[in-house]
């Protein structure tokens, strides 16, 4: 929690105003931030200075794992995070590759589970990683990559958190996640949860111990219409003790995650927080 608040304060104090062409808004911006989450000791990085809807973050991650490309499928899991980008993004609405309402195109999980090969067919990056780790293999390239410039025109949004690199030291699994762009007030609490949970889930289904998850942000920013509530409300609140995160121990394989797992298979214990803050979302 401290590292999150320190980053927010750093942006407020030292950030540079940058015009964002996509949203038409100014962003107070810093370059490079490194966060760490001790998954092995269940130090769950859930924000307490405002209410954080962790279930929606986990639901979105599960949708990526399943390779979903439709906002309706994400809603069924329990998150509306893709409603706006799939249906309110003017450039995407006019894109000939859009298949209709709720279609997201070839983004995130589609790339992770069905990266198109130039000679035809697809690569299931995630399955390869799970198979390797289950067999104790780390080829120094256990990388789940969502960033495919050759297909940016076929999706509603470029990936923000685009790379997840898993590493084994003995029987302990580590994760390095890289994020090119981060809406800190609105998105970072989601992203922190997802990095933590991704390592916890992958360790569980591959039979490994969870170690530390390392989360790198390149462009970390606060939009101009988010600055006042961050500076004048959230940063003036005292953080509370952190909760613990739990996963149903019956989840034992990638197939389990693909088929029967629901949000009821994840729960948080001891979460206390301040009141919610409604930050504006920029499409």
Curated annotation (Swiss-Prot):
Positions with a binding annotation for (6R)-5,10-methylene-5,6,7,8-tetrahydrofolate: 183, 282
Its job: Catalyzes the reductive methylation of 2'-deoxyuridine-5'-monophosphate (dUMP) to 2'-deoxythymidine-5'-monophosphate (dTMP) while utilizing 5,10-methylenetetrahydrofolate (mTHF) as the methyl donor and reductant in the reaction, yielding dihydrofolate (DHF) as a by-product. This enzymatic reaction provides an intracellular de novo source of dTMP, an essential precursor for DNA biosynthesis.
Enzyme class: transferase
Subunit relationships: Homodimer.
Lineage, top ranks: Bacteria, Pseudomonadati, Pseudomonadota, Gammaproteobacteria, Vibrionales
Natural source organism: Vibrio atlanticus (strain LGP32) (Vibrio splendidus (strain Mel32))
Catalytic activity, EC: 2.1.1.45
Active site per UniProt: 160 (nucleophile)
PANTHER family per UniProt: THYMIDYLATE SYNTHASE, THYMIDYLATE SYNTHASE 1
Protein's recorded name: Thymidylate synthase
Gene that this polypeptide is encoded by: thyA
Reaction it catalyzes: dUMP + (6R)-5,10-methylene-5,6,7,8-tetrahydrofolate = 7,8-dihydrofolate + dTMP
């Amino acid at each position: 929690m401290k590292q999150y608040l320190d980053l927010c304060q750093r942006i407020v104090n030292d950030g540079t105003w940058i015009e964002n062409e996509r949203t038409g808004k100014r962003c107070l911006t810093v370059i490079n931030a490194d966060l760490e989450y001790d998954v092995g000791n269940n130090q769950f990085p859930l924000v307490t200075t405002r209410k954080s809807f962790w279930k929606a973050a986990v639901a979105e991650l599960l949708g990526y794992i399943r390779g979903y490309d439709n906002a309706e499928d994400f809603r069924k899991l329990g998150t509306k995070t893709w409603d706006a980008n799939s249906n309110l993004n003017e450039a995407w609405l006019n894109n000939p590759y859009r298949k209709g309402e709720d279609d997201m195109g070839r983004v995130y999980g589609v790339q992770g589970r069905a990266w198109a090969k130039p000679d035809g067919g697809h690569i299931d990056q995630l399955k390869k990683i799970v198979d390797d780790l289950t067999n104790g293999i780390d080829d120094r390239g256990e990388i789940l990559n969502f960033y495919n410039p050759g297909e940016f025109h076929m999706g509603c949004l470029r990936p923000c958190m685009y790379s997840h690199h898993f590493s084994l030291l003995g029987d302990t699994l580590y994760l390095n996640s890289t994020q090119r762009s981060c809406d800190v007030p609105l998105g970072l609490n989601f992203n922190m949860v997802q990095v933590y949970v991704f390592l916890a889930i992958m360790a569980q289904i591959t039979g490994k111990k969870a170690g530390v998850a390392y989360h790198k942000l390149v462009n970390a920013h606060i939009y101009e219409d988010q600055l006042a509530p961050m500076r004048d409300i959230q940063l003036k609140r005292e953080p509370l003790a952190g909760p613990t995160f739990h996963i149903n121990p019956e989840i034992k394989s990638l197939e389990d995650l693909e088929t029967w797992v629901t949000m009821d298979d994840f729960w948080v214990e001891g979460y206390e927080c301040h009141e919610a803050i409604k930050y504006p979302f920029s499409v």
